């Protein structure tokens, strides 16, 4: 029986570096940035959730369930991950940011392979030089650990997953796959690079 893998696209942040604009809805090459992410991960998972704390109606137009953080106050990506872990019945949950339009088409396959090779509970993606802490594949059983971490007042993903049994899935062959678009300048540069 094949594994059931769901994904959550994290679009719940404040987007300070994007001038406060909701990053997932910012146009990139003629379509909202989140649409690029959806197109990359949809073939790899069973269901997609979108974590958003504003503009939920607009996000719902993409045809996926929209969930908000369980805790108020824009507590960062872990809060969105926690909300998704409470919604999924999957064997694994993939977490990705809404502002990475070039995610690998073999992301889930390679992350799952890293988990199985190490016997880990989760995997974090790496571009070969640094880990990408928002790009995780994890077992939903990690929810209690994540919730306790947040309740203790911690928010840094790196500190949380460092306490877990995790593997690293390396994508050195795709070094630009995890490029984030955080500013209007980066958006303009990405558009130029695509022409």
Curated annotation (Swiss-Prot):
Its cofactor is Mg(2+). Its EC number is 2.7.7.77. Keywords: Cytoplasm, GTP-binding, Magnesium, Metal-binding, Molybdenum cofactor biosynthesis, Nucleotide-binding, Transferase. GO terms for molecular function: GTP binding; metal ion binding; molybdenum cofactor guanylyltransferase activity. The gene is mobA. Signal peptide: none annotated. Transfers a GMP moiety from GTP to Mo-molybdopterin (Mo-MPT) cofactor (Moco or molybdenum cofactor) to form Mo-molybdopterin guanine dinucleotide (Mo-MGD) cofactor. The N-terminal domain determines nucleotide recognition and specific binding, while the C-terminal domain determines the specific binding to the target protein. The keyword Kinase does not apply. This is Molybdenum cofactor guanylyltransferase. GO terms for cellular component: cytoplasm. Mg(2+) binds at residue 99. It catalyses: Mo-molybdopterin + GTP + H(+) = Mo-molybdopterin guanine dinucleotide + diphosphate. Belongs to the MobA family. The keyword DNA damage does not apply. One of its GO terms (biological process) is bis(molybdopterin guanine dinucleotide)molybdenum biosynthetic process. It is found in: Cytoplasm. InterPro entries: MobA-like_NTP_Trfase (IPR025877), Molybde_CF_guanTrfase (IPR013482), Nucleotide-diphossugar_trans (IPR029044). Pfam families: NTP_transf_3 (PF12804). It comes from the Bacteria. GTP binds at residues 10-12, 23, 51, 69, 99.
